[in-house]
Amino acid sequence: MNLLEQYSQDPQFARLLAQEELILEVTETLCALLEKEQVSRAELARRLGKSKGFVSQLLNGGRNLTLRTLADVLSVLGYKLKLQPEKTDGQGGRGRMVT
């Protein structure tokens, strides 16, 4: 059993891992949408009425992304969010975000 498998047996670690995986998936999805829509971070900040620093922190995972903020970002890009939870084996893991 490798170290990750050992840690995955710890429920607290599994929850933290699931949180970090979700943050990564959301921020990667937002970055992909920006690229697809050819919207710069500066333009996103302008559309949101926020600073460029705010957007950078948001997309780098350094700022807690609330559901309201996520909805705002998706809205100004012309998208909405549909969640599709997936059952895990009880050791963490993530569902899927569908835009």
Task: Please state what every model-predicted region is.
Residues R68-Q84:
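DNA major-groove recognition helix of helix-turn-helix/homeodomain DNA-binding modules
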Residues S40, T66-T69:
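Residues that mark the N-terminal boundary/hinge immediately upstream of a DNA-recognition element
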Residues L34, A45, L74:
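The alpha-helix within a helix-turn-helix
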Residues M1-A32, G92-V98:
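N-terminal flexible/basic segments that precede or flank functional cores
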Residues P85-G92:
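Short amphipathic recognition helices of helix-turn-helix/homeodomain-type DNA-binding modules
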Residues Q38-F54:
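Short alpha-helical DNA-recognition segment
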